[in-house]
């Protein structure tokens, strides 16, 4: 099951101008969509963006770079495109591995946003399981338990891999089997890498740079504690299995014109004004 996706032409979804020039890149000019889709949007607007993306994106490409973590929900259409391109199905499903400091499975009643997209992917019939790994955020702690979508956790379609977070509430709600808790990110990474190596299957890898410790890279979201070597061990364990991938988490600033985006992004502790003029 050898794959060459990581060596194919990288594609930049250039919505916010934060991704530097890459050798051999394909860059899609999508800046006109920034206010509309950044952080989140309604499903109708997202469908319009997806149509614009489909019109420009080739069927085959390498890793997609999406800029700020505010655009992590763009992984949803990319994963569905991957499923179609690879002719995957319930009989031959896709596994999704997300390296992220947040679960991205939080309630959002107005459509989809960067913190809610995982639920939609996990419940796709051609996706066997989503593993969100590297979580040190309080988003899966007791105070925010009510914000997590429980359906994919209860259905056995989604697992949280975390370190240093009290997730005792999961046992009380009967979803503790979906939680893999570790004393350290190092233990988490070793265990995940071993599982991925032993249970090979077509895999989509999505990396949000906020999973990394601040000494590795700086983002404008609260960050985790993963080291570069630990991420590389996980990627190495997926050798020959990756059929699609994306990276998000670059730093960019944006002054939202939409009131609820200003309110929600501030409530999430995000700094959207880094370097803003």
Regions found by a protein language model. Give the residues of each.
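Conserved alpha-helical scaffold segments that buttress catalytic/binding sites
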Residues: 2-277
């Amino acid at each position: 099951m050898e794959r060459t996706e990581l060596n194919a032409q990288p594609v930049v979804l250039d919505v916010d101008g934060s991704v530097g020039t890459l050798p051999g890149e394909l860059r899609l000019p999508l800046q006109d969509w920034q206010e509309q889709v950044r952080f989140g949007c309604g499903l109708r607007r997202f469908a319009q963006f997806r149509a614009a993306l489909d019109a420009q994106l080739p069927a085959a490409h390498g890793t997609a770079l999406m800029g700020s973590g505010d655009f992590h929900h763009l992984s949803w259409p990319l994963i569905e495109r991957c499923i179609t391109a690879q002719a995957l199905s319930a009989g031959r499903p896709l596994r999704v591995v997300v390296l992220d400091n947040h679960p991205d499975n939080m309630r959002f009643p107005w459509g989809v946003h960067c913190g809610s997209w995982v639920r939609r992917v996990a419940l796709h019939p051609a996706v066997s399981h989503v593993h969100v790994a590297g979580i040190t955020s309080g988003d899966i702690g007791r105070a925010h338990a009510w914000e997590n979508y429980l359906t994919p956790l209860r259905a056995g379609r989604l697992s949280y891999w975390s370190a240093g977070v009290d997730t005792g509430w999961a046992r009380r709600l009967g979803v503790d089997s979906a939680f893999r808790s570790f004393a350290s990110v190092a233990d988490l990474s070793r265990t995940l890498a071993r599982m991925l190596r032993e249970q090979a299957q077509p895999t989509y890898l999505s990396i949000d740079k906020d999973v990394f410790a601040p000494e590795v890279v700086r983002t404008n979201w609260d960050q985790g504690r993963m080291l570069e070597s630990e991420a590389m061990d996980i990627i190495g364990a997926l050798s020959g299995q990756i059929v699609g991938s994306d990276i998000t988490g670059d730093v960019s600033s944006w002054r939202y014109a939409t009131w609820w985006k200003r309110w929600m992004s501030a409530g999430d502790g995000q700094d959207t004004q880094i370097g803003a003029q």
